[in-house]
Amino acid sequence: PNPVEAPETITTVGPDGSPAAWYTELELTPEELAQVRSMNLTACFELINASEWDNANLIGFQDACEAMNIKIVGQGCCDLDPIQQKTNMESFAALNPDIVTCQPQDLDVCAPTFDPLWQAGVKLTFMSNVPTGYTAGKEYVGAITDSIVDMGIDSAEMMADAIGGEGEILAITVADVNYVCNTRDDAFLKTIAEQYPNITVAEVGGFSSPNEAAQITSALLTKYPNVKGIFVSYSTPCIDVLQTVKALGRTDIKIVTMDLDTTCALDMAQGGNIVGIACDMPYAMGYGRALMAAYACIGKECPGYVTSPSFKVTRENLLEGYRTSLGIEAPADVQAALNG
């Protein structure tokens, strides 16, 4: 995707409260690139889940590694499970890589998962989340994220537009300590509370695992049958929420979520329940994680926290959303539904 210029004000801050750098600041000179290529580095990549969004992260990382002659020797997926993540990191450690990248889970207790890696000299770069107690440039190189506050604001604005600025809504959010999801969810709730006095969040349903979202939604819709909209933290649980809403025959409910996914996009294209998706640029974030690791491997000072753009996707700009967010054309069935 084409580079996006930094906004006048960057709203994202790192876990320590310091302002984030803009993602286009990450670059290597031709001489630095040649130096990295000559090192024959190796890397391991852990997916967060089996989503199109995370796959775009992986593709970005792979493309950057190819450009820098970094060989990917290990790959895993944690499905947001800190126990599985610990197992994956142990498997990665056995491969003796130079670089490991992932999104840490359950931040207050996950440091022991990563301690053996950095203590062995592995360069750690993270997606959005940082283990509690870790300092950039010490235990890890840096982390890259989306404009997480802006995504929450965008979601609130799309919800308000969809329900006419008034009525009851539900919010299905991440219950665990997850810096990026917690920040995005909180920004949504804060914007609704402060900017839309005629919209009431009837209840916030928190999930620890995405597969809990359907049951939570079903229970809350029984409790609050008059809700006009549902906000869902991100697209994976949103798929289950969407199926639940459809099974109940609630074609009237407007759903807003975050992160592009074909199931959600197809429903949007068909004029279904999903009316807004707050999006970011996962390909660019995957690419950036590889660059940050390369910085550390050649001793170049790296920003501790880096952010990248967010934007609203509705039915009107869905095709462009695919290009900007995932760096691909929308699937044929999504294109057909838009033209139908």
Model-predicted segments: where are they?
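Hydrophobic alpha-helical segments within soluble ligand-binding/sensing domains
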Residues: 26-28, 143-169, 183, 212-214, ...
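Extracytoplasmic "Venus flytrap"
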Residues: 10-60, 64, 68, 73-91, ...
